[in-house]
Amino acid sequence: MSFALEETLESDWVAVRPHVFDEREKHKFVFIVAWNEIEGKFAITCHNRTAQRQRSGSREQAGTPASDGSRGPGSPAARGRSEAAASATAALRSPGPRKSQAWAEGGSPRSARSLKGDPPRGPAGRGPESPLRSPARAKASPLRRSAESRDAIASATPVPPAPPVPPVSSVRVVSASGAVSEEIEVLEMVREDEAPQPLPDSEQPPSAAELESSAEECSWAGLFSFQDLRAVHQQLCSVNSQLEPCLPVFPEEPSGMWTVLFGGAPEMTEQEIDALCYQLQVYLGHGLDTCGWKILSQVLFTETDDPEEYYESLSELRQKGYEEVLQRARRRIQELLDKHKTIESMVELLDLYQMEDEAYSSLAEATTELYQYLLQPFRDMRELAMLRRQQIKISMENDYLGPRRIESLQKEDADWQRKAHMAVLSIQDLTVKYFEITAKAQKAVYDRMRADQKKFGKASWAAAAERMEKLQYAVSKETLQMMRAKEICLEQKKHALKEEMQSLQGGTEAIARLDQLESDYYDLQLQLYEVQFEILKCEELLLTAQLESIKRLISEKRDEVVYYDTYESMEAMLEKEEMAASVHAQREELQKLQQKARQLEARRGRVSAKKAYLRNKKEICIAKHHEKFQQRFQSEDEYRAHHTIQIKRDKLHDEEERKSAWVSQERQRTLDRLRTFKQRYPGQVILKSTRLRVAHSRRKSTASPVPCEEQCHSLPTVLQGQEKTEVGGGGSQLGPSQTAEPQSLVQLEDTSSEQLESTSLPPRAVVSSELPPPQSAPLLTSIDPKPCSVTIDPLPPPLPPTPPPPPPPPPPPPPPLPVAKDNGASTTAETLEKDALRTEGNERSIPKSASAPAAHLFDSSQLVSARKKLRKTVEGLQRRRVSSPMDEVLASLKRGSFHLKKVEQRTLPPFPDEDDSNNILAQIRKGVKLKKVQKEVLRESFTLLPDTDPLTRSIHEALRRIKEASPESEDEEEALPCTDWEN
């Protein structure tokens, strides 16, 4: 029967909660009954004395003063009444003082005139009507006639007098004969109980908020007619029939037209009213003791009736029924297992084993029913989610929807996907719990049987050996299924952690959260390794059990004794077909068993190899985990060390900045003082001519040895100045353009020397080849590349020529350059050779008068070595340029030395197992066009995000470590063949 059909069949049934009317703690309740003359009904008031005492005691402890009147049963404060409660007493027709001494001393509990006199009644016998409506009053009875009568009744709710009135306890039943004596005892006991008692230390008083919320739970009130009280009596008698003779006899009420003519309520004297009030009060007390407060309060005051408090859903009831059946099956198995201690004979033990098998089958059936019922809602949710997602997908593909509708459908699809995922997780958890119950029961039965094996010998135990093998197989199978269910759950958790790691966003706590997730992942991975070890262990136990059973069968087949008819020879026996067939069948059966045993041995060997593989993976995982922790600690230590060093560096930097600021400040002050001094005392400025300054510098250079760097920078300036002088016609004075040219040349020389110094040797040669021909300084500065900055003044007119020294011997001719294989190499070589020739020509074109000062500064060997280095650089550059064999082939093709031979295209035979859809070359031959990829997309794909974002880099590193620690290569291994327990 389906669950939907069960719901429809049981829709008219209700489930009542068990022990719903049990009271957690006993409370003391007091009933006060009085007669309302305005409505002609009984006014019944009930007070919870225990709650009132707790509230008043907590108020005293909280420091809020409470008067005596606040603790009285009829106090307005006790019931949440207003100050107008006193006026409501005028509407009550209370009985006069009783003749008994007890009533004279204590006053009537029902009387409103015990301490306060009633106002005089009018001619009609009715007092003033009070507008008060008690907030603590509940609905009087389910048999109320109309809402208007309830409003009228509420206006005349009785308010009992002040505290001196002793309430009547509802503990005893007062009979008609001994009413007075019993009443005296009850009143005295109540007075003793009403004395203020200190609260025990264990009882903590409620707070003020709880007091306000529970104010309406201390008192209840209502108006009841004779008919209402009879209906209440019928309901109480249906609960307990002992109350049938206890209801007092009420006078007959007129009905129909008589109510219009003679009024609704019968005329009664004060003595009759007092007697009825007293009897009704005693009746209510007896009903409280018999039926309990919950039933009585719900019958009298039904305002706080909550159906959820009494009824429970049918699904919960059905689940409890399944659980009770499961508990009974568990207890049955436990009882049978306990009987093993007293059994001594093998026959009784075999009978007990049969009973255990039946009990376990009933346990498995009860467990299956329970968990099938628990799984059904999650299965329905999964199916509903899948169906809804499929509908959303079809709607998005086929319908013409706007962007907002598409966005809402996508959100709904994500919501249904999440619900389906949660349902799958719940199904997996319930599956694990199911197999835990069955595996635990099987394990208990198997352990008990192993303990029984020690009591009996091998011969007697042979009768139970087959059952023990079956039990071992069943235990291994149940444990294997439980472990595989756990493995699926752990894999789901791992997948969820990995997705959370990949979806982390930037933030202050992102790195810490990533570390926590990685740690959780490692813990889950270790748990997964343990579960996988248990799985392999169970598989090994299954194989071992099968091997043992097969070996036992083989030994039984071999030891089996077969009796044949007598024959003279073996050939004669084999001549008969039946005998030959039986012998061959036995041999074939033995061969099959032996082959199966060998297969099981091979599978067990593979399981052992896989266990070793998992053990190594587990060690790698632990090592990675420790390595991560060590890296974290090391990074923290390095950060601390670097932080201390950085602090020291920052301090030194601050000190240097302060010193430099102080120096610059002092320098500025000095300059300001000099400026003010010059402004205050202006003096005569003397300017020296250029010729005098150059002569002075020459005398200074001849007097003191000049460093090589200054010589290197001064020589080109002098040479260029002399050349300009000769070109200008040997004039005695230079124009502004002529004086500016040497300065520009000096600047060009400085920049070229800096470029040469900042580069390696081959670029230096290239740069030197690009300089103007008249400058030979790059060749000279390449010998000693040190930075130097020399300020050079404009050159004076040329000096008279001096006899030149003998010229240096000419350098040896350079070796012939190899033939360039490409345009770039030949162009570079030709350029460098021309630059070298220009340099030599410029050196030769320098007049002898100009080379006189440089004779004692340079040696010719330096120039020769510079030329050699330049040529070696050019040769090395050409070798690097033509080192590619493809360049040689292209150069030879240009020269026409050989021609290429046309080769026919080879067609490779296709692989037998390869499909054309997987071969990109075959697809291209068929005419499939390739998609053009833009360079920007490639550039974006090759950009490494981990280098730019530290969080992304950390996520990639964590995923890499996780991949190394996880057994992701299991799929590449040879998988175990599917076994019968996996089906």
UniProtKB/Swiss-Prot annotation:
Protein purpose: Acts both as a nuclear p53/TP53-cofactor and a cytoplasmic regulator of actin dynamics depending on conditions. In nucleus, acts as a cofactor that increases p53/TP53 response via its interaction with p300/EP300. Increases p53/TP53-dependent transcription and apoptosis, suggesting an important role in p53/TP53 stress response such as DNA damage. In cytoplasm, acts as a nucleation-promoting factor for both branched and unbranched actin filaments. Activates the Arp2/3 complex to induce branched actin filament networks.
Domain WH2: 916-933
Keywords linked to the UniProt accession: Actin-binding, Coiled coil, Cytoplasm, Cytoplasmic vesicle, Cytoskeleton, DNA damage, DNA repair, Lipoprotein, Membrane, Nucleus, Phosphoprotein, Ubl conjugation
Polar residues compositional bias, start-end: 50-61, 734-761
Region (Disordered): 50-167, 723-855, 962-983
Regulation: induction: Accumulates in DNA-damaged cells (at protein level).
Subunit annotation: Interacts with p300/EP300, the complex activates p53/TP53 transcriptional activity. Interacts with TTC5/STRAP; the interaction takes place in the nucleus and facilitates the association between JMY and p300/EP300. Interacts with TTC5/STRAP; the interaction takes place in the cytoplasm and results in the inhibition of JYM's nucleation activity. Interacts with MAP1LC3B; the interaction results in the activation of JYM's nucleation activity in the cytoplasm.
Record membrane topology: Lipid-anchor
Any one GO MF annotation of this record: microtubule binding
Biased composition (Basic and acidic residues): 831-846
Compartments in which it is found: Nucleus; Cytoplasmic vesicle; Cytoplasm, Cytoskeleton; Endomembrane system
UniProt-reported outcome of changing residue 981 to A: Decreases the activation of Arp2/3 without affecting the intrinsic nucleation activity
Annotated domain remarks: The N-terminal region is involved in actin binding and actin nucleation activity.
GO cellular component terms, A-Z: autophagosome membrane; cell leading edge; cytoplasmic vesicle; cytoskeleton; endomembrane system; nucleus
Protein name: Junction-mediating and -regulatory protein
Predominant cellular place of this UniProt entry's protein: nucleus
Organism from which the protein derives: Mus musculus
